[in-house]
Amino acid sequence: MPVASSEYQNEHYASFATTSRLVTCLVSETLVPVFFVPVKSVDRNNQFIGLCLLLRPTTVKQESELPTNITASDILTVVPLRGLPILNNERVALFNGIRCPQIDLVDFLDMLPHIYSVESSGSLKSGDSLKQKTFDTLSAILDGNKTFDLVDGYSAVQLWNHFAQDLEINSKLREQIGQELGSSILFQKYTYDNPKPLPTLNSSTIKWEQSVVEGHATHPMHKARKSFPPMPPLNPGSYDLDHPAVRLVGIPRENAILRGEYEELSAPLVNALMDAGGNHKDIRAQYQNYVFIAIHELQLPNIQEKFKDAVIFSKEHQLNVEALASLRSVARPDILPGLSVKLCLGIKISSALRTVTPFTTYFGPGFSFNVVPKLTYDHEVLAIERELGTITYRHEDSDVAKHCSSVIREALEYDPKYQDDLFIPCGALVEKIQRPDTDETLVAHVWNLDTKEKRVEFLDRYVDFALRSFLPPCLINGVAFEAHGQNTLARFDRKTGLLKGFVIRDFGGVKAHNETLKKSAGVELDILPDSCVEAHSLEEVFKLLYHTLFHCQLQRLIRVLDLHYSGEGWEIVRKYLTQYVPKDHVMWPMFMESSKVPGKCLVRMKIDELYRDYIYRPVPNMIKYEPQSVPEAI
């Protein structure tokens, strides 16, 4: 069992975890001018190589403009770096004769765990050597009064408020986003304060699902759990989100939209809920004109307020279930072997309320039964978990209906016939070992990847199998799965730890090009009007695959295996892309020739209050990454 680090440490690291992700987004989404400030002499002992300098958005009038001189009051924040971010050597600012290239992309792993605000009215107070080096490096490029102080621990909420004020974002949205960032920090600290036993090759999939420490590597709301009325406020420790209760609710049959085999597949869980407080035969006889649904306990106030004809059974009719990494999907393998259940949860987790829209409940079963069997993919390395049955409340407003719906999904990981295999959410592999003050991750710890040779061997097989899994449906059928670390499970042999393949789940974020699908597989998408599943071009499909598989999944593994800065990890990616993508395919130039690719803008989407519609901006194509050298100061 890991020992919890100190409360002060946890508070500092929790703030850093969230704020560093906000910095990452401000940089990659070009929301502010950002430059790399080289240190005069690199000191490898404290890993300090330079600064990530974020200027206020008011510093330049146009995005294309390069500032020529800056003062302390122009600075939004400054972050000392231990690893080189992705530099744009074609856009270099000259500050006091020091060449400062623009930063196009920075990762939280590039940063030392200190984020400073600049107090231009003060003077430097005593601090550690890193603070002094940061001060000296910064002073060298500033014009005007160089009397200022650096204050460590600049929080995401403070940074956001400063940025939003400069950008004149309306006060209501500013406050809302600030609250979500604050929630992220609070829940991150709670996770650090309460470390769990480290999972092993013998652990259950559920233990791995619940081993997530920091979550999404680039989303500032990576740990946010924010409820809204009529739900009570959700605070760290106020509810056990890993082991929630589900309650029995009945919906008049005429108000239930059913797809697939929902009633048959949900029957064991529904009967168990009925039997927990009575007899399922008697209850079914009494409520013959009702369909039944398991509802997350925290969601009950929304059911009560929005669905007046729903029957909420007494608290006796409840069962505890195991939450998966998403928190709203749950499992009870003893009651529903080989299945999992996606529930509605009216809580904002990262980007949106974790409800289940009618678009999702309609699309899943049709895609599962009609399209999945026709897709081109290697069944030896990829298993696709179909969505076999869904239920949604019949309501003309989809924003209301999404609060009372559910999906029954295949789950190989909970099927007894696969007990010799270990299924792990890929995002869990790259998580820290339940401590904030370490670089050691579960993949290196559990697989004992203590040499470079072992790390290269592990990554090589992983990339090979991942591309064999997710490229063919995209290349041939025009279908991209949302293959990020939460939706993708890696399948290992429990005895040897050898990777056997992957599993993909959750069709809510699939993108498909109907014309290509029809031409290659002879089937078409069956979707509701305004569904965001249908892509109007193949580029849309490739964008989703790049963001989820390459940016969110493979990049994380390459970085934690320490194969990023050397470029070796990306060489492996290019090796297999060259093997599996024909040079005359339209995917080739986007992935293998373009220096920039469309990057998903998480903060711009929050500012524009978007969830189902994405905003993209050009970001460096990491597939093309080559090693960089630290620029000289002059």
UniProtKB/Swiss-Prot annotation:
UniProt KW Cell inner membrane keyword: no
Expression induction or repression: Expression is repressed in iron-replete media.
Entries under Gene3D superfamilies matching the protein: 1.10.510.40
Major enzyme class: ligase
Keywords attached to this entry: Ligase
A GO MF term: acid-amino acid ligase activity
GO biological process, one term: siderophore biosynthetic process
Enzyme Commission number(s) of this protein: 6.-.-.-
Keyword Oxidoreductase (UniProt): no
Signal peptide positions (record): none
Function comment: NRPS-independent siderophore synthetase that catalyzes the rhizoferrin biosynthesis from citrate and diaminobutane via an ATP-dependent condensation of citrate with diaminobutane followed by the addition of a second citrate to the monocitryl-diaminobutane intermediate. Can also use as substrates the citrate and diaminobutane homologs oxaloacetic acid, diaminopropane, diaminobutane, diaminopentane, tricarballylic acid, hydroxylamine and ornithine.
Name of the protein: NRPS-independent siderophore synthetase rfs
Natural source organism: Rhizopus delemar (strain RA 99-880 / ATCC MYA-4621 / FGSC 9543 / NRRL 43880) (Mucormycosis agent)
This protein's encoding gene: rfs
